Amino acid sequence: MKDKFKHFKEMIRTRDVNKEKFNELIKNSLHDEYMYVRETALVVGDEMIDHVNDLFDNGLIIEDIKLLYEDEDTFLWKDIIRIDGKRFLTTNIQFWKDGKNWREMVGGREVSDDFSLDQITGS
């Protein structure tokens, strides 16, 4: 898939308007062998879609997002999210196979209210 970052941002905007369309867009982008590695769990396919929807349903806000790298096989970005009154800087990487998201890892840390993506080295 070309322009993964653009597609990702469009998916997020769709979630605010049409949850079913959002779910369909995610599902269509996942490889049959998809795995999502979180801090404490390994999640597959529909479980990941449910996890993402639970986050949004519980008030997740993506405050800012920055593309770090993208090519045919790799998609890497950082974002600042807010949930439960706390802000987190997350690092997200996807590995693509056969034009679909095959593996995904996310890590994060809490940041202050005045932290911005511009503070990341290399910005």
What are these regions (language model features)?
Residues 51-123:
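A beta-strand edge to alpha-helix "cap/lid" segment located at domain peripheries
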